[in-house]
Amino acid sequence: MAYKPQFYPGATKVAENRRNHLNPNYELEKLREIPDEDVVKIMGHRQPGEDYKTVHPPLEEMDMPADYVRDLVEPLNGAKEGHRVRYIQFADSMYFAPAQPYDRSRLYMIRLRGVDAGTLSGRQVVECRESDLEEFSKNLLMDTELFDPATSGVRGATVHGHSLRLDENGMMFDALQRCVFDEKTGHVMYVKDQVGKPLDQPVDVGEPMPEAKLREITTIYRKDGIAMRTDPEVIEVVKRIHRARTLGGYIPTNEIFKGL
């Protein structure tokens, strides 16, 4: 019998949203169309139209020793061409943002190849070959329901603000003011790249989601939304993991896991 992954425990809407993010067969809703060159501008690693910098020759030109693993694993296009590794980093507001750091890392590892993810309490960075990074940053991370212009921020540095209250326009605090709310259009405009360097022209990333939409798709448990304690299966799994880590440590024994 084929194994059917559960991805995440729980019966609440938040648990369902987390499962959807982690399930590669689930198609995330596309909400906007940000031009490729605008994503490149926000990331700030190269100018639109500029050639990709490389760190080694194309793989087909390299004389490498035989390796069974290399023969089994199809390299990413960026690896084939020798493109350098670059990053994109997101901060997600605790006020019902669609995604959050651990959710991002889990879905990156499941849905993507050739990535390295770093997870902190209020930000999440992912690294990859530059050309591949640009492709999935647009199509997966910014054009879909994973991104809300007001409560999700592309922030390569000075990420603070994820735990602060939203402003009158529903915008998450940003010490570098990388993006602003345009009251005329109702859209969010990036005026700086992810590390705070001013852009020549503002980049329009669309209008913020309504709070009702955020509450519907968020992966964040909140007491004033859907509390984690209302989901018995999630609590059971979290307690089991915590107990196993606390008592088992680096030397897990059968006695430790009895009754878990």
Swiss-Prot record:
Family matches, as Gene3D superfamilies: Methyl-coenzyme M reductase, gamma subunit
GO CC terms of this entry: cytoplasm
InterPro entries reported for this sequence: Me_CoM_Rdtase_Fd-like_fold, Me_CoM_Rdtase_gsu, Me_CoM_Rdtase_gsu_sf
Secretion signal span: none
Residues given in the record as coenzyme M binding sites: 123
Cofactor requirement: coenzyme F430
GO terms of molecular function: coenzyme-B sulfoethylthiotransferase activity
GO biological process, one term: methanogenesis
EC number(s) per entry: 2.8.4.1
Key word Transferase present: yes
CDD domains: MCR_gamma
Pathway: One-carbon metabolism; methyl-coenzyme M reduction; methane from methyl-coenzyme M: step 1/1
Cofactor note: Binds 2 coenzyme F430 non-covalently per MCR complex. Coenzyme F430 is a yellow nickel porphinoid. Methyl-coenzyme-M reductase is activated when the enzyme-bound coenzyme F430 is reduced to the Ni(I) oxidation state.
Subcellular location: Cytoplasm
Keywords: Cytoplasm, Methanogenesis, Transferase
Catalyzed chemical reaction(s): coenzyme B + methyl-coenzyme M = methane + coenzyme M-coenzyme B heterodisulfide
Source taxon at top rank: Archaea
Family: Belongs to the methyl-coenzyme M reductase gamma subunit family.
Function: Component of the methyl-coenzyme M reductase (MCR) I that catalyzes the reductive cleavage of methyl-coenzyme M (CoM-S-CH3 or 2-(methylthio)ethanesulfonate) using coenzyme B (CoB or 7-mercaptoheptanoylthreonine phosphate) as reductant which results in the production of methane and the mixed heterodisulfide of CoB and CoM (CoM-S-S-CoB). This is the final step in methanogenesis.
NCBIfam families on file: met_CoM_red_gam
Summary of subunit composition and partner proteins: MCR is a hexamer of two alpha, two beta, and two gamma chains, forming a dimer of heterotrimers.
Protein known as: Methyl-coenzyme M reductase subunit gamma
Species per Swiss-Prot/TrEMBL record: Methanococcus vannielii
Lineage, highest ranks first: Archaea, Methanobacteriati, Methanobacteriota, Methanomada group, Methanococci
